[in-house]
Regions:
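N-terminal nucleic-acid-engaging modules of covalent nucleotidyltransferase systems
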Residues: 1-218
Length: 218
């Protein structure tokens, strides 16, 4: 298992998943990646690939909209908001915009961001009030980001990876990766409201003892 999961590896896996339209290939690629991770990073990665910043049962949100993303990208790269808008219109995706301008703004890239740091940023954004403060937090991490790290960090904050991977396919990948029944994975995820914990339990073959959690809607 990988001791420290990098956002770059997550992003490269996401790119491979996006490059195929075949569901079996998508789940195989994701399953191979998930098997390499430690339990904490497995939980993070499963949530993120399902498009969740937090567990489904967790009511927290980052409240990071387009204005914060635009301002942070501008501050991190030196491009003005006026430069960014026509690029966004052309590309149609804030993550693709991030990748393009980071690549142009930096002469060299050294991917260093981890999934732990990604989770920390998401938590801090949720806890922080005010557009300026949120922008500063995001800018600081974007300044360290490679084009691919920036692309998927922004996609995650925007709420959609857009790689053709819905939650049911993530459940399927978990089931295949850890040799569990898909029905058991899906049922546990429904009861737990956390696909990350579901993935960890699937690895441990501990899906049958899951109980519904009170006050967490199914």
């Amino acid at each position: 298992m990988s001791e420290i999961a990098r956002l770059q590896d997550f992003a490269e896996t996401a790119e491979s998943i996006a490059a195929t339209t075949k569901k079996l290939e998508k789940t195989a690629l994701l399953g191979s990646y998930l098997r390499m991770l430690s339990d904490p990073d497995l939980s993070r990665a499963a949530r993120y690939f399902a498009g969740h910043q937090f567990a489904q049962s967790d009511s927290r949100t980052t409240n990071v909209g387009g204005s914060i993303i635009s301002a942070a990208l501008s501050e991190a790269t030196g491009f003005s908001p006026e430069d960014l808008y026509p690029r966004y219109v052309r590309l149609g995706d804030p993550g693709d915009l991030a990748a393009e301008i980071i690549k142009e703004a930096k002469q060299s890239f050294q991917p260093t961001i981890t999934l732990v740091e990604t989770e920390s940023l998401i938590t801090r954004l949720s806890d922080t009030r005010g557009i300026k403060n949120k922008t500063s937090l995001l800018t600081a991490l974007l300044r360290r980001a490679s084009p691919l790290e920036g692309k998927y960090l922004i996609k995650l904050l925007a709420g959609d990876l857009r790689i053709g991977l819905r939650e049911g396919l993530v459940e399927d990948a978990i089931a295949r990766a850890f040799e569990q029944q898909l029905a058991d994975v899906a049922y546990a995820n429904m009861l737990l409201g956390d696909i990350g914990e579901t993935a960890v339990r699937a690895r441990a073959s501990d899906l049958r003892d899951v109980n519904m959690r009170l006050f967490h809607p199914i």
